[in-house]
């Protein structure tokens, strides 16, 4: 809104130059040529506002031109317009952050590069058949039929968009988040990019899982790295997350030979997923309709700072099943740590979009 307001204020210089209105706030004379520059500056700021609303990543380039032109006009009319420098300075900060975010070293561009090098034209995937799922427990077979996986192409990858909320720690306030992720299943990989802000300061994060190695990075203002977690606890935890995503968002991938199944009762199965030398176990709970309604694992580790890790039970209760181009998935989930002090629900996710078997980056 500051950008829009600043843009509209520049119309005053244009109006005074062409005598469209009496501007008592502007005591210095403004030529018609200068008035045209005030108009151009106004248009630039309004364009920046619209580009930002439309989530066009190049908005900051137009903003640089607008700020430079605006500040030159302010200097020429310093006595009347000097306070515009404050607004230009306020707009400059997010421009700098956006510029840093456009550098190859930004988490957003690392995420994009990692995904792009794994996307390629793929052969036509065969449809999932009843024969493919006959080795699965009856409950899992019912789940795959319920989700519409049978008769559709097997899943090699997917792209997912979330909106939701997260907490840093127990008792903290919820933060609004937006995220995007790509998962790959021919060669296991998961890339999860998240954006949010705290006290008005933007930050972003990247979970990267390739092979069986995981890292988590968080940067403030795309510049200051505050978390860089890695190690065996991260590797184990993100193996759980990769399998959780498979169960929730890519049921067709549950025919994977690296999963061992055990029917516990009519609505519960135990699954052990192995990726090279890492094995994790989870309990999957279903309802009578065939929906997966909870995923519970004891193999995930909690950390507030990416340095100290604690092993707690982790669960993701699920609901809100909806159809996406013939595939039905849960669109609402929570992530809960079961700590000695009690349950800590630290994330709530709403699925906004999901696509399967992509060949190009979106």
Regions found by a protein language model. Give the residues of each.
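Membrane-interface extramembranous regions
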Residues: 1-106
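N-terminal leader/targeting segments and the immediate start of mature chains
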Residues: 108-159
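N-terminal mature ectodomain segment of secretory-pathway/periplasmic proteins
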Residues: 141-223
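Short, hydrophobic/aromatic-rich segments at coil-to-beta transitions
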Residues: 154-161, 185-193, 215, 263-272, ...
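Short, exposed beta-strand/loop patches in secreted or surface proteins that constitute
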Residues: 180-185, 207-208, 257-264, 284, ...
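Short, solvent-exposed aromatic-acidic interface loops
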Residues: 195-201, 219-225, 297-301, 335-340
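Flexible, processing/modification-adjacent segments and terminal tails
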Residues: 217-275
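Gly/Pro-enriched, hydrophobic low-complexity segments
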Residues: 270-356
């Amino acid at each position: 809104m500051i950008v829009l307001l600043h843009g509209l204020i520049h119309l005053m210089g244009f109006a005074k130059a062409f005598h469209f209105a009496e501007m008592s706030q502007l005591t210095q004379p403004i030529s018609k040529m200068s008035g045209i520059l005030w108009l151009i500056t106004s248009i630039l700021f309004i364009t920046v506002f619209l580009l930002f609303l439309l989530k066009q990543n190049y908005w900051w380039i137009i903003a640089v031109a607008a700020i430079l032109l605006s500040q030159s006009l302010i200097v020429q009319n310093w006595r009347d317009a000097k306070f515009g420098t404050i607004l230009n300075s306020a707009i400059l900060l997010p421009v700098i952050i956006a510029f840093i975010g456009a550098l190859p070293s930004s988490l957003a561009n690392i995420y994009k590069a990692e995904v792009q090098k794994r996307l390629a034209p793929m052969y036509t995937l065969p449809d999932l058949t009843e024969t493919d799922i006959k080795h699965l427990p009856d409950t899992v077979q019912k789940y795959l039929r319920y989700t519409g996986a049978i008769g559709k192409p097997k899943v090699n990858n997917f792209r997912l968009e979330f909106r939701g909320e997260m907490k840093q720690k127990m008792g903290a306030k919820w933060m609004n988040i937006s995220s995007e992720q790509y998962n790959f299943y021919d060669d296991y990989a998961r890339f999860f990019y998240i954006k949010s802000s705290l006290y008005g300061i933007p930050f972003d994060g990247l979970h990267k899982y390739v092979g069986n190695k995981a890292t988590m990075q968080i940067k403030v203002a795309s510049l200051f790295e505050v978390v860089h977690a890695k190690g065996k606890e991260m590797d184990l935890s993100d193996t759980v997350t990769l399998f959780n995503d498979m169960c929730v968002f890519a049921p067709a991938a549950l025919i994977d030979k690296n999963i061992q199944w055990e029917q516990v009762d009519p609505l519960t199965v135990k699954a052990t997923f192995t990726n090279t030398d890492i094995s994790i176990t989870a309990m999957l709970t279903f309802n009578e309709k065939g929906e997966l309604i909870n995923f519970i694992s004891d193999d995930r580790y909690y950390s507030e700072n990416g340095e100290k890790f604690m092993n707690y039970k982790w669960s993701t209760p699920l609901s809100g099943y909806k159809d996406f181009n013939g595939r039905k998935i849960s669109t609402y989930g929570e992530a809960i740590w079961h700590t000695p002090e009690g349950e800590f629900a630290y994330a709530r996710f709403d699925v906004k979009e999901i696509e399967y078997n992509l060949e190009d980056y979106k």
